[in-house]
Amino acid sequence: MEAWLAKPELLSADADAEYAEIIEIDLADVKEPVLCAPNDPDDARLLSSVQGEKIDEVFIGSCMTNIGHFRAAGKLLDKVKGGIPTRLWLSPPTKMDAHQLTEEGYYGIYGKAGARMEMPGCSLCMGNQARVAANSTVVSTSTRNFPNRLGDGANVYLASAELAAVASILGKLPTVEEYMAYAKDIDSMAGDIYRYLSFDQIADFREAAANAKIPVVQA
């Protein structure tokens, strides 16, 4: 662990790993965003087939997000004049992300937009900290959208954080052209937005880790 922390690398499969199935997707063939329609995570749809759907609430959070997604949402929200037409929930996946986003001024942007900030963690994904309004139509970045999971009778689309942010601003699922205009804006700032975060980059978290007392349970 100490060696990995000194030189962290993303995990990768062994060269001789065996798989039940290999599915190859040419990303050049993907011309528009893909969502999962209510209320089945296996019901994948192209954005163009569901565009225009009115959206009541948006959740950006869960373990599917990282700090870059919240920066991207913040950049888009910062350009909005006045309030947004949806109820927006934001829940960074870790306290570390929340700390850094606060330091970078994003929490002020979220507050100005009227977003509801949840404690870092699962939040709406499991419906165990709060729930969306009954029978609302929602865009969520979570991993599952089973019936009644996020709220009673809620219709939940699963989408990327960037698409979710756009939906929160427009109050609907955007057209492909509308989304691409926002995406172009995000892409122009990608180098600043999509910087991954590790706790060893923050002094407070590094100190806490160094002084952590981990009990050892002996059989």
Regions found by a protein language model. Give the residues of each.
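Fe-S-dependent hydro-lyases/dehydratases of central metabolism
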Residues: M1-A219
